[in-house]
């Protein structure tokens, strides 16, 4: 876990709790994603690492974001600037998205297969994961021919490796033991 992630967690949690309370989770997620993109701009990064006063930095940042941030979003940026935490915005946005996924009972699953999966195979994998994890699953599919055959699935802390490559590696280890 990076230092910025540790710094970002309480800010992301506070923003998420506020968004839940006000029933504006999607709006806050959009604001944070936009602000994170602005914070990753090389010119803005230079500005944030310079000797600009926090009030001025917040004002400049909010002007750049324009109408993408509502009054509460602008206040959030001011608090981050005053505490010299604007550089944590990308991590804050990422953590906010994780909190939202947990709240919505959603999870992203990375599915790697030896060949491209068709729509039915993707639907079958998604349904099986939803049943096993008791969550709505969004698949991120990729192809890795080195798997030989089968699939490798990673969803949160759960890893399911049904690839031939993995089975061959286990067999090799067993024979060498």
From Swiss-Prot:
GO MF entries:
proton-transporting ATP synthase activity, rotational mechanism
Q: What does this protein do?
A: F(1)F(0) ATP synthase produces ATP from ADP in the presence of a proton or sodium gradient. F-type ATPases consist of two structural domains, F(1) containing the extramembraneous catalytic core and F(0) containing the membrane proton channel, linked together by a central stalk and a peripheral stalk. During catalysis, ATP synthesis in the catalytic domain of F(1) is coupled via a rotary mechanism of the central stalk subunits to proton translocation. This protein is part of the stalk that links CF(0) to CF(1). It either transmits conformational changes from CF(0) to CF(1) or is implicated in proton conduction.
Q: Name one Pfam family in it.
A: OSCP
Where is the protein localized? Cell inner membrane
Q: Which UniProt keywords apply?
A: ATP synthesis, Cell inner membrane, Cell membrane, CF(1), Hydrogen ion transport, Ion transport, Membrane, Transport
Q: Which PROSITE patterns match?
A: ATPASE_DELTA
**Ubl conjugation as UniProt keyword:** no
Q: Which GO terms describe its cellular component?
A: plasma membrane; proton-transporting ATP synthase complex
Q: Which family does it belong to?
A: Belongs to the ATPase delta chain family.
Q: Which HAMAP family match?
A: ATP_synth_delta_bact (MF_01416)
Membrane topology note? Peripheral membrane protein
Name used for this protein in its record: ATP synthase subunit delta
Organism encoding this protein: Pseudoalteromonas atlantica (strain T6c / ATCC BAA-1087)
Q: How does it assemble?
A: F-type ATPases have 2 components, F(1) - the catalytic core - and F(0) - the membrane proton channel. F(1) has five subunits: alpha(3), beta(3), gamma(1), delta(1), epsilon(1). F(0) has three main subunits: a(1), b(2) and c(10-14). The alpha and beta chains form an alternating ring which encloses part of the gamma chain. F(1) is attached to F(0) by a central stalk formed by the gamma and epsilon chains, while a peripheral stalk is formed by the delta and b chains.
* Top-level taxon: Bacteria
């Amino acid at each position: 876990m990076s230092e910025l992630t540790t710094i970002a967690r309480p800010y992301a949690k506070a923003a998420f709790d506020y968004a839940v309370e006000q029933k504006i989770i999607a709006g806050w997620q959009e604001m944070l994603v936009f602000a994170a993109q602005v914070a990753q701009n090389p010119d803005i990064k230079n500005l944030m690492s310079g000797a600009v006063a926090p009030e001025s930095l917040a004002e400049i940042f909010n002007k750049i974001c324009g109408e993408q941030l509502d009054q509460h979003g602008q206040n959030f940026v001011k608090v981050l600037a005053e505490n010299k935490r604007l550089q944590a915005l990308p991590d804050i946005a990422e953590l906010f998205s994780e909190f939202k996924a947990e709240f919505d009972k959603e999870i992203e699953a990375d599915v790697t297969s030896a060949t491209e999966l068709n729509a039915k195979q993707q639907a079958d994998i998604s349904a099986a994961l939803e049943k096993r994890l008791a969550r709505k699953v969004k698949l991120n599919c990729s192809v890795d021919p080195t798997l030989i055959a089968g699939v490798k699935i990673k969803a949160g802390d759960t890893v399911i490796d049904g690839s031939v490559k993995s089975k061959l590696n286990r067999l090799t280890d067993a024979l060498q033991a």
